[in-house]
Swiss-Prot record:
Assembly and oligomerization: Heterodimer of MSH2 and MSH6 (GTBP).
Family recorded in the similarity comment: Belongs to the DNA mismatch repair MutS family.
Organism, scientific name: Zea mays
Membrane spanning stretches: none
GO biological process, alphabetically ordered: mismatch repair; mitotic recombination
SMART domains: MUTSac, MUTSd
UniProt-recorded name of the protein: DNA mismatch repair protein MSH2
Binding site for ATP: G667, P668, N669, M670, G671, G672, K673, S674
GO molecular function annotations of the record: ATP binding; ATP-dependent DNA damage sensor activity; mismatched DNA binding
Length: 942
């Protein structure tokens, strides 16, 4: 091996310990492996891991950030590039590939020479093999879900069969639904289920264009795995499910009979996840019909715009809604439930109010909240512990942690019983009764008796999980021998402290870990006794927390202890299996217990957030979707106001039917338009999740969907420009939104020419007003769009019925210095000036550049450099731009342009060749140009 050592985080990379013969044998094996561009393959060499070929290059570039980490294994003629990976770096790589990325899979091989075998494999949707590594030191905050899809056409209508698998919660689900060409329902399902991986048949019907579906999967950050169509089979499905589903098979047959297209995907999932190959799955799964209409629909654009999920570049956790609301969730099961709730906001007013009632109970009773929080902190992740019990390699640790968690039930029950507020009936039915049922049926008593009888709980202080020595005489003998050795070790501890003139435990500690029994002292104490240490003791390790050392007596005693403990472990092995098996029979009860506690955990976190902010959150009034308005007084963006050094300026939002249901918001860049429309979406989502909201007062009409077109970025990797991405997202809104949705659109049309952008923006506004009729916040730099609020003639009566209102973000220009000051207040009325040049000044552009910009603006747009203040807006708005076209020209021209766009969109391009499309487009353009002869606004496009 050649090349300089690379030292990530201050330590050298592990050295390759292969001789020439071993290297040649491995190279021979490695080159025979089948090619898989997605697979990252790592090889376990006991003390370290290695990666080879393209995988080594990937790891060097992605994780070490230098190619100097690469080594050549073997001769230059047939050798392969390689990289060594420490155990700590292996955990980092595994977490990144399986929990953060969606373009790789992970494979782990064990063996030596040319004899290696695949022992673990994982994908973002199936992490089971690596769970112990991934979550050894971290909570599991999300439940990875695999989904399988099967698109099919019936009578010219596209349908999609969907099945999902949640291996963490042992749940299967099915759904099928009609779909549009943009696969908007699939996107909503992928978001709501939190999918990490999607199975798709590689050879679908040729009449179905899968490109939009693949784009949806990519936009949702989901790994696409193509399988043969033959894998999507439903033969013997009921029989197979009968082995893994709890209860009778008859309800399963009845459920399957309701589906035509979802059965194939379900069969593909069973095969792909190999559920039938693991007998620990038998009788442990549930299956359900998944209904897309149970929750608010969110697409990937809305998730990004509202910052729902944590991002890789987030500086702190408050950058995302999940990070902010996860402030006091204590364990993984609560965090996973919060993650699911944020992607599945409720639609039922009663369900929303039930959650709000419980949050209010905790908000109003600090002692109740604090008491529960202290108990919840002492509870482990019950879902994962129950999952661990089902593994064939399960040991006593999950049994003990379940026992310790369940021991908190009487305390939680007692705290809840003390609450006698206005929501006591709800608290009793939701939390107290399930806990009392657990206690009344003596489930806790039976499990506790098992653990207390079978396990030596006194040894937990030493970090050991032992079967009680009372179980057998052999264990009793070994326990006595261990006690004798322990006494010798403790006596040696005292003698050593005396020899070094140190106090026992305070200055000289006795520890037991991977190094066996060792002594530890601080670096400061080590300097005082260094001479004595040099003569009679052996220093094992020096770290920040102190110096670990031993001597011959301690080493011999430690070796004796380890040997006896090994015998004890072997002797208790059968009993351990029995205890784990019996504990596993309580799994269903544990799962119900976990569901109660995780919901309690999340609602507690909501209450903590509502009361701990500088300005407390308020309870929103919730009305049905066909009633009420959306009124947010003094609303704030929860994530922005939580940032250090931010003094957030609140704003009112009044989306009132017939008055201001559709709002056009103008004003300078950086003035707060984007923040305002996003915070409205965030407040609505938080309310429907069941949380208090950052407002002074809030009334919210339930929305079935939030659509967002905010800040489209380039997607060059997918061959999609900023403008095309903007149009694709807008197309999803036009096709998927209803009058019960909430739409937020920011700066539509800025990715193309001014005239094209304005024409599109006008036509889209008209469509949303006339057809969709949903509450809409439309932030724009096209000030001419404000004319839409004044069209009250008979021809546009349907627009005035919805209620169109103009708002602007305030700005002040000093008349003398011409300096711009952002006020960040949203106020009634239109802003008819662009502040682009002022913003450039604000950003300290060179004076010469600003002067030239003003000159060109004056030439091209007849820009007035002298401020002219209108009576209603005064100096908060600024100078006006001369209108070149009359409102009538704009209205008629935009209507004709919209007709052109609708006709063009209706062309069946999938059925036409290029020459025919060009012929039709040329004719349509000629007709439009003819109509433009008497319309100055339309003429500008030619």
């Amino acid at each position: 091996m050649e090349g300089d050592d690379f030292t990530p985080e201050g330590g050298k990379l592990p050295e390759f310990k292969l001789d020439a013969r071993q290297a040649q044998g491995f190279i021979s094996f490695f080159k025979k492996l089948p090619q898989d561009p997605r697979a990252v393959r790592l090889f376990d060499r006991r003390d370290y891991y290695t990666a080879h070929g393209e995988n080594a290059t990937f790891i060097a570039r992605t994780y070490y950030h230098t190619m100097s980490a690469l080594r050549q294994l073997g001769s230059s003629s047939d050798g392969i590039l390689s990289a060594s990976v420490s155990k700590a770096m292996f955990e980092t790589i595994a977490r990144n590939i399986l929990l953060e990325r969606t373009d790789c899979t992970l494979e782990l091989y064990e063996g030596s020479g040319s004899n290696w075998r695949l022992t673990k494999s994982g994908t973002p949707g199936n992490i089971g093999s690596f769970e112990d590594i991934l979550f050894a030191n971290n909570d599991m905050e999300d439940s990875p879900v695999i989904v399988a899809l099967f698109p099919a056409c019936r009578e010219s209508q596209l349908y999609v069969g969907l099945s999902f698998l949640d291996m963490t919660n042992r749940k299967l689900g099915l759904a099928e639904f009609p779909e549009d060409s943009r696969f908007t329902n699939v996107e909503s399902a992928l978001v709501a289920l939190g999918c990490k991986e999607c199975l798709l048949p590689a050879d679908c019907e040729k009449s179905i264009d899968l490109n939009p579906l693949q784009d949806v999967i990519s936009n949702c950050n989901v790994l696409l795995t193509e399988k043969k169509k033959a894998d999507f089979k439903s033969r013997d499905l009921a029989q197979d499910l009968g082995r893994i589903i709890r209860g009778s098979v008859e309800p399963v047959r009845d459920l399957l009979s309701q589906f035509d297209y979802a059965l194939g995907p379900l069969g593909a999932l069973l095969s792909y996840a190999e559920l039938l190959a693991d007998d620990t799955n038998y009788g442990n799964y549930t299956i359900e019909k998944y209904n897309l209409n149970c929750y608010m629909r969110l697409d990937s654009a809305a998730v990004r715009a509202l910052n729902i999920a944590e991002g890789k570049t987030d500086v702190n956790k408050n950058f995302s809604l999940f990070g902010l609301m996860n402030r006091t969730c204590t364990v993984g099961m609560g965090k996973r439930l919060l993650n699911r709730w944020l992607k599945q906001p409720l639609l039922d007013v009663n369900e929303i109010n039930n959650r709000l009632d419980m949050v209010q109970a905790f908000v109003e009773d600090p002692e109740l909240r604090q008491g529960l929080r202290q108990q919840l902190k002492r509870i482990s992740d019950i879902d994962r512990l129950t999952h661990s019990l089902r593994k064939k390699s399960a040991n006593l640790q999950p049994v003990v942690k379940l026992y310790q968690s369940c021991s908190r039930i009487p305390y939680i029950k007692g705290i809840l019983q003390q609450y006698n507020g206005q929501f006591s009936t709800l608290i009793r039915s939701k939390f107290l009764e399930p806990l009392e049922e657990w206690m009344a049926k003596n489930r806790f008593g039976r499990f506790s008796s098992l653990v207390e009888t079978a396990i030596d709980l006194a040894q937990l202080e030493n970090g050991e999980y032992r079967i009680s020595p009372l179980y057998s005489s052999d264990l009793g003998v070994l326990k006595d021998e261990l006690s004798v050795v322990e006494n010798h070790i403790n006596n040696l501890h005292v003698d050593t402290a005396s020899d070094l003139d140190l106090s026992v435990d305070k200055q000289l500690k006795l520890e037991k870990g991977s190094l066996g029994h060792v002594f530890r002292m601080s670096k400061k104490e080590e300097q005082k006794v260094r001479k004595k240490l040099t003569g009679s003791y052996l220093i094992i390790e020096t770290r920040k927390d102190g110096v670990k050392f031993t001597n011959s007596k301690l080493k011999n005693l430690s070796d004796q202890y380890q040997a006896l403990f090994g015998e004890y472990t072997s002797c208790q092995k059968k009993v351990v299996g029995d205890v784990v098996r019996v504990s596993g029979t309580f799994s269903e009860v544990f799962e119900n217990f976990a569901a109660v506690l995780s919901e309690l955990d999340v609602l507690q976190s909501f209450a903590d957030l509502a009361t701990s902010c500088p300005v407390p959150y308020v309870r929103p009034d919730i009305t049905a979707s066909d009633e009420g308005d959306i009124v947010l007084l003094g609303s704030r963006h929860p994530c922005l106001e939580a940032q250090d050094g931010v003094n957030f300026i609140p704003n009112d939002c009044t989306l009132v039917r017939g008055k201001s249901w559709f709002q056009i918001i103008t004003g300078p860049n950086m003035g707060g338009k984007s923040t305002f429309i996003r915070q409205v979406g965030v407040n609505v989502l938080m309310a429907q999740v069941g949380s208090f909201v950052p407002c002074d007062q809030a009334s919210i009409s339930v929305r079935d969907c939030i659509f967002a077109r905010v800040g489209a970025g380039d997607c060059q990797l997918h061959g999609v420009s900023t403008f095309m991405q903007e149009m694709l997202e807008t197309a999803s809104i036009l096709k998927g939104a209803s009058d019960k949705s909430l739409i937020i659109i920011d700066e539509l049309g800025r990715g193309t020419s001014t005239y094209d952008g304005f024409g599109l923006a006008w036509a889209i506004c008209e469509h949303l007003m006339e057809v969709t009729r949903a509450p809409t916040l439309f932030a724009t730099h096209f000030h001419e769009l404000t004319a839409l609020a004044h069209r009250n003639d008979d021809e546009h009566q349907h627009i005035s019925d919805i209620g169109v209102a103009n708002y602007h973000v305030g700005a002040h220009i000093d008349p003398l210095s011409r300096k711009l000051t952002m006020l960040y207040k949203v106020e009634p009325g239109a802003c008819d000036q662009s502040f682009g040049i002022h913003v450039a000044e604000f950003a300290n552009f060179p004076e010469a550049v600003v002067a030239l910009a003003k000159s060109k603006a004056a030439e091209l747009e007849d820009f007035s450099t002298t401020p002219t203040f209108s009576d209603d807006l005064k100096d908060e708005v600024g100078s006006k731009r001369k209108r070149v076209f009359s409102p009538d020209d704009i209205t008629r021209g935009a209507a004709r342009a919209r007709l052109f766009l609708e006709e063009f969109a209706a062309l069946p391009m999938d059925e036409m060749d290029g020459s025919k499309i060009l012929e039709m487009a040329t004719k349509m353009k000629a007709d439009l140009q003819k109509d433009a002869a008497d319309n100055p606004w339309l003429q500008q496009f030619f």
